[in-house]
Amino acid sequence: MGSRPSTKIPAPMMLTIRVALVLSCICPANSIDGRPLAAAGIVVTGDKAVNIYTSSQTGSIIVKLLPNLPKDKEACAKAPLDAYNRTLTTLLTPLGDSIRRIQESVTTSGGGRQGRLIGAIIGGVALGVATPAQITAAAALIQAKQNAANILRLKESIAATNEAVHEVTDGLSQLAVAVGKMQQFVNDQFNKTAQELDWIKIAQQVGVELNLYLTELTTVFGPQITSPAFNKLTIQALYNLAGGNMDYLLTKLGVGNNQLSSLIGSGLITGNPILYDSHTQLLGIQVTLPSVGNLNNMRASYLETLSVSTTRGFASALVPKVVTQVGSVIEELDTSYCIETDLDLYCTRIVTFPMSPGIYSCLSGNTSACMYSKTEAALTTPYMTIKGSVIANCKMTTCRCVNPPGIISQNYGEAVSLIDKQSCNVLSLGGITLRLSGEFDVTYQKNISIQDSQVIITGNLDISTELGNVNNSISNALNKLEESNRKLDKVNVKLTSTSALITYIVLTIISLVFGILSLILACYLMYKQKAQQKTLLWLGNNTLDQMRATTKM
């Protein structure tokens, strides 16, 4: 039995899905509100649903290339059918041979298998070089070998049926559907008509349709006619081969109509030829499609910036290109792991990055917290369309209203102008004429001004200028340092040695001691001198008193 690719989700991805599902239970779906941001030059261009896809599931589609005509009309179309049959064999035999070579390259020895596999691939490669992608595709082809063998076992019954769509389940390890685009044409044209058709008309109709289908076959395969390991068949190619009957297989594999158009655009539905039988003209294709998990609460919002007018010149907001919001949490979304379609993102993993408080506040509607960069030049397109209206920087270009006639002026201090059908029905911007059908309601903020403190330098030329100023400042500082060094060089280094410093300290202490002793001695001598003066003064006074007393006597 053929091996079946595992659809088990790896543990890290399962954890991511569980976290996202928990958030979806407690938080409503959110997206960035672009109404307060538009006048600040930040435009939300659209939202996309975020999905996770993992290991693919597979099914087989058996294309019945040769239709069965009604018995009474076989002779009529024998000539074009025979020519078509020969052309098919010539066209697809190299493909069948290449498939067989790759599938037969499997051997029991481990080392020989890789060598034979690469050799089988190189056999169908013009330059003799097998890329890793081709080796991987060939390995998948080998894995489908048993399923292809089981289909060939039922080839006679599949070729004999007149049904345009026929589910084949007997002995197959995966879902297989036999379809016949040409059989559908035969059934519609001949089996269900009541009018008689002449032989010539039957032959002409069959011949034209067979030639058209041959053209589609050559368009579908291209270089893969010689090597099935070159490229995968796209979903568009599969539809060309199987017609509308392709929907039957996709529905059986669980792809809903609401998801089908998005998956077709994603390129995740592909096919690989696994067999070709020239006897019955059956072409087997293994169809691969992803298992998709929807994150109902998560939306990816795409942001574009418009050059706005500031007092420091033209600038654009510094915001991420893609953000996602869950509840009150806004983070930057890395889309390098995702495949984008018009409405959806299909990611193998969800990777987000936290934003600074300033950017978070800006995207939450606080435009005064938005930061701008002087990176937009005058040649940048100064306008952007959104929902039938226009956001334009009318200071960078002339906003001329054709109907009603007039010039739309942008007031001083305004970052951009919001123009809708209420103010102008037909608008001319730099030679481009636009008919406006949208309208900015009252919830859109207008007349927003960008402060000088919100504009920073990030452009290459501006940064070079600022770096030049910094270099000048550094040069001036170096000159001052050189001058200081010259002054220091004049100082005697010997006087600043350790031993000299110790000597200076000791001498200073001795000097202080002698100074203190001298001060004490001086104080003592002064005290003694004053005492002597007092004694002499007393003796003088006493002698004078005695002399006065003697005189009186």
Swiss-Prot record:
SUPFAM superfamilies in alphabetical order: Head and neck region of the ectodomain of NDV fusion glycoprotein, Virus ectodomain
Lipidated residue numbers (S-palmitoyl cysteine): C523
Residues spanning the membrane: 501-521
Entry-linked Gene3D superfamilies: 1.10.287.2480, Head and neck region of the ectodomain of NDV fusion glycoprotein, Newcastle disease virus like domain
Site label Cleavage, positions: R116, L117
Residue pairs linked by disulfide bridges in the UniProt entry: C338-C347, C362-C370, C394-C399, C401-C424
Subcellular location field: Virion membrane; Host cell membrane
Residues bearing attached sugar chains per UniProt: N85, N191, N366, N447, N471
Magnesium in keyword set: no
Modification after translation, per record: The inactive precursor F0 is glycosylated and proteolytically cleaved into F1 and F2 to be functionally active. The cleavage is mediated by cellular proteases during the transport and maturation of the polypeptide.
Bilayer topology annotation: Single-pass type I membrane protein; Single-pass membrane protein
Pfam annotation, one family: Fusion_gly
Coiled coil: 142-170, 466-491
Fusion peptide: annotated segments: 117-141
Keyword Secreted: no
Origin superkingdom: Viruses
Keywords, in A-Z order: Coiled coil, Disulfide bond, Fusion of virus membrane with host cell membrane, Fusion of virus membrane with host membrane, Glycoprotein, Host cell membrane, Host membrane, Lipoprotein, Membrane, Palmitate, Signal, Transmembrane, Transmembrane helix, Viral envelope protein, Viral penetration into host cytoplasm, Virion, Virus entry into host cell
Signal peptide positions (record): 1-31
Extracellular side: 32-500
Record GO biological process: fusion of virus membrane with host plasma membrane; symbiont entry into host cell
GO cellular component: host cell plasma membrane; membrane; viral envelope; virion membrane
Family affiliation: Belongs to the paramyxoviruses fusion glycoprotein family.
Subunit structure: Homotrimer of disulfide-linked F1-F2.
Primary role: Class I viral fusion protein. Under the current model, the protein has at least 3 conformational states: pre-fusion native state, pre-hairpin intermediate state, and post-fusion hairpin state. During viral and plasma cell membrane fusion, the heptad repeat (HR) regions assume a trimer-of-hairpins structure, positioning the fusion peptide in close proximity to the C-terminal region of the ectodomain. The formation of this structure appears to drive apposition and subsequent fusion of viral and plasma cell membranes.
Name recorded for this polypeptide: Fusion glycoprotein F0
